[in-house]
Amino acid sequence: MAQMTSGLYPMFGFFICLLFLPASWEAGANTFQELQKTGEPSIFDHLLPLTPGLTRRALSDHKNSGQHPPDLPKSTATQKPKRQCNTVRLVKPVHKPIDDAKAADYGNTTVGHEPFPASEKNLSSQGKHPMARNERSADDHGSTNSEKRSDGGHSTSAPMRKISCKPVTRTSGTPVSSTETSTKLRTTSQKPETSSHDSDLIRKSTSLPVKSTEVSRTSYRTPRSLGAERHTIPFTSDKSIQLTIEHTKEATRSQSTPTKYERETRSASERISRAHVPPVENHTPSAGETTTQVSAKSTKHTEEATTSTTEKATKAPERPTVNLNTTGLVKAMENTSTAPSPHLHKTETAHQGITGSLTSRMDLRPITSEAHHLQQNTHSLPGGLHSVQEREGSNSFPAWAIVVVILMAVIILLIFLGLIFLVSCASRARHQLTQNSEDAEPEDKGGRNSYPVYLMEQQNLNLNQISSPP
């Protein structure tokens, strides 16, 4: 047992070490990535400095020989994580001469570019950090800007070299291939013939910003004459200028057209106002004739209204108040309709007189008709107004109240019938009980099991021989 326990302890410690090793490796890799993002130098930079001169020599030797570099010896034990640096040579695009016809097609500042190989893009995207990628993209933009600023000097620019480092953990049985990646990048970077499709795409992408800059230049050169612009501006910018001029002309025409519509609307409104004028003037004499007739009739109706009852007098002043409001509204509408025309000042007074007479006629007719009906009712009925009021009061009783009263009466009747039935049942039961009691009394008096005989037998007999009572 002691040997088993002594063997288990080292095994347990070994497993714990195996568990902690991946965690420590991940922590070290994270710290190196953070240092690489912030740009702070780490301890391993001082321990493993890379000389760019040696890498350049190795690259040139491998290029001339055309052979792969020898594999490095395999490490037999796990080592601490180190930063593996990949030297990448970014070859700037070379300026090439272009004919005048091609320059006219692409613009005054178009330049032939040598594309970056596709293999270099893939390898750099796999092995480089995002910060290094951003630096490379910034350099690419800087190179394109420098090409645009150049006035046509055809000179090959020197290739740029960059070092992108990343942390690498070396374990047992894994060879380190830093020089292989650098030589592959070098050898593949000088084969632009294999990526012809990519070169066309890059040329198209580089031609787009050139066109955009030319359009922006035309916007600044607009004050100049059109002849000078035709010599300096490309074909695309001429189209844009012509389109803008046409749009401005159309906008000015669209702004000038509403004036025609306004004139038409004004003329139409004047015609409408003129059309409204003659009917009013034609109807004025007939209205004057009707006013005299209405006034004559109104005097008769007012005399009849005074002889009516007190209710007639209370109803009569209520109606004219409502009609006065309507007359005010009619006057306001007439004033608004006749305001535009200056020739209708005389007709307004006639309208006011007509409306006053018409409203008086409309007011007096219903009043007199109601008074006449009330007089007929009072003369025909024996009870007079009191009987009419009583009928109105009786008719005002709601129907749902009648239904409720009927239901309550039915319920009371049912309760009364139930009480009668219960009383009869109780009386019958009591009668039966009285008859049974009367039948049992003679047997108790003259029977064999009477009270004194039972007592005598109980005294004479023993306790064991006593018979139970029936």
From Swiss-Prot:
Q: Please indicate if the UniProt record lists Ribonucleoprotein as a keyword.
A: no
| CC per GO annotation | cytoplasm; plasma membrane
Q: List all topological domains (Cytoplasmic).
A: 423-470
Species of the source: Rattus norvegicus (Rat)
Residues on Extracellular side: 30-401
Keywords of the record, alphabetical order, are: Cell membrane, Cytoplasm, Glycoprotein, Membrane, Signal, Transmembrane, Transmembrane helix
Q: Which domain of life is it from?
A: Eukaryota
Q: What is the lineage of its organism?
A: Eukaryota, Metazoa, Chordata, Craniata, Vertebrata
Q: Where in the cell is it found?
A: Cell membrane; Cytoplasm
Q: Where is the composition biased (Basic and acidic residues)?
A: 132-152, 194-203, 260-273
Q: Encoded by which gene?
A: Mucl3
* Sequence ranges of Polar residues compositional bias: 75-87, 169-193, 204-222, 283-295
Stretches the record annotates as Disordered:
57-234, 248-318
* TM spans (from-to): 402-422
- Its primary localisation, in coarse terms, equals membrane
Role, per record: May modulate NF-kappaB signaling and play a role in cell growth.
Q: Where is the signal peptide?
A: 1-29
Specify the protein name.
Mucin-like protein 3
Membrane topology, as annotated, equals: Single-pass type I membrane protein
| Glycosylation positions in this chain | 122, 325
Looking at the keywords, is Secreted present? no
